[in-house]
Amino acid sequence: MKIKWLGHSAFHVETAKAKILIDPFFTGNPAFRDGERRAVTAGLTHILLTHGHGDHVGDTVAIAKETGATVLANFDLCMWLGRQGVAKLEPGNTGGTIRLGSFSATFVNALHSSAQITEDGVSHSLGNANGLVLHFDDEPTLYHMGDTDIFSDMALVQELHEPEIGIVPIGDRFTMGGAVAALACQRYFKFATAIPCHYGSFPIIDQTPETFVAGMDGASTLVATPEVGGIVNA
């Protein structure tokens, strides 16, 4: 498995049988490198969304139309995407598992909101915010937490799914910060590898993973902090 960080919470996950984008926020993402777009959309099979905020839905509509990739998201967000012309949708909701060829995706809780704001400034709810647990046939289990704070039922995510790779938001203000994210990883999970995200993009969130890395000192988990465009092999 190759996991490429694309800035903010966007990732490209490549296995022998699937090419997946998670939360593909490219346009307007200060951290995204424009030259990456063609490489990470070539042969794309799936787009997975954790929630409906613009910095996570990102370029989903355009990419789905360009590539024909299947989009998985919560039910309300899928209904909205359908109205935008996205044809191949896999709607679900918290607790549900959907089989997608060589892997399955399970919607788990996240403590966050999920909405789009229209031109009149009104915020319209787009279902629950979620984390996503991906179980692959021949690869490590991956848990993208989405945007969230720490919560005690993370213990159940570990018990039920035993994720080996954690993608963890650490930027503070809109998600948990680095110290709390490290506490979540150490108290509730047995990750072999943790990859921090949701930092270093907008100036009002944390710019580096230093606090998270310091909080993980002494843990058995490998903390991987790739540069934007860098790859973690798992």
UniProtKB/Swiss-Prot annotation:
InterPro entries: Metallo-B-lactamas (IPR001279), RibonucZ/Hydroxyglut_hydro (IPR036866), UPF0173 (IPR022877), UPF0173_UPF0282_UlaG_hydrolase (IPR050114)
Hydrolase as UniProt keyword: yes
Domain of life, source organism: Bacteria
Family the entry assigns: Belongs to the UPF0173 family.
Molecular function as annotated in GO: hydrolase activity
SMART domains attached to this UniProt entry: Lactamase_B
Key words of the record: Hydrolase
Organism expressing this protein natively: Sinorhizobium medicae (strain WSM419) (Ensifer medicae)
Name of the protein: UPF0173 metal-dependent hydrolase Smed_0942
Gene3D superfamilies: Ribonuclease Z/Hydroxyacylglutathione hydrolase-like (3.60.15.10)
NCBIfam families: PRK00685.1 (NF001911)
Intrachain S-S bonds: none
Pfam assignment, any one: Lactamase_B_2
